[in-house]
Curated annotation (Swiss-Prot):
UniProt GO BP: DNA replication, removal of RNA primer
CDD domains from the UniProt entry: RNase_HI_prokaryote_like (cd09278)
Domain RNase H type-1, chain residue ranges per copy: 1-141
Catalytic activity as recorded in UniProt: Endonucleolytic cleavage to 5'-phosphomonoester
Subunit and interaction comment: Monomer.
Organism classification: Bacteria, Pseudomonadati, Pseudomonadota, Gammaproteobacteria, Lysobacterales
Signal sequence extent: none
Cellular component aspect of the GO annotation: cytoplasm
Designated name of the protein: Ribonuclease H
Length: 150
């Protein structure tokens, strides 16, 4: 089973507003960047999309260490998801889970992999987190119709 390191981030200019997501996949000394965006989104949706797209890109089962600066994503997948599934996608307070379609897609994308979900503090000097932050922000800027920066 291949060991893959993944770094993800999402960005939104306003919440909701133009959004971008990015992922960096690293395997055996090689890197692949993924990025995309939506004209109207939220930061949480973009964080979810970054993880989803990274996992869906992998064509075979992998051992993954996935770094995210989103507690929403990390806690959602590692702590809250079992209860949501048990309660038919309702929160502990019986409300519908927000972004359900993305959570279901993420849940499906995790099934063939072994994933260690790691939280990294955003905007704190981690070079890989900073890299995906710039990529995601540039996608959000492009969705707004602006010029991206490096």
């Amino acid at each position: 089973m291949k060991s893959i390191e993944v770094h993800t981030d999402g960005s939104c200019l306003g919440n909701p507003g133009p959004g971008g997501w990015a992922a960096l996949l690293r395997y055996n000394g090689r890197e692949k960047e993924l990025a995309g965006g939506e004209a109207v989104s939220t930061n949480n949706r973009m964080e979810l999309m970054a993880a989803i797209m990274a996992l869906e890109t992998l064509t075979e089962p992998c051992q993954i260490v996935l770094h995210t600066d989103s507690q929403y994503v990390r806690q959602g997948i590692t702590e809250w998801m079992p209860g949501w599934v048990r309660r038919n996608w309702k929160t502990a307070g019986c409300d519908p889970v927000k972004n359900r379609e993305l959570w279901e897609r993420l849940h499906a994308a995790t099934q063939r992999h072994r994933i260690d979900w790691r939280w990294v503090k955003g905007h704190n000097g981690d070079p890989d987190n900073e890299r995906v932050d710039v990529l995601a922000r540039n996608q959000a800027i492009a969705q707004r119709g602006g010029l991206a920066t490096s």
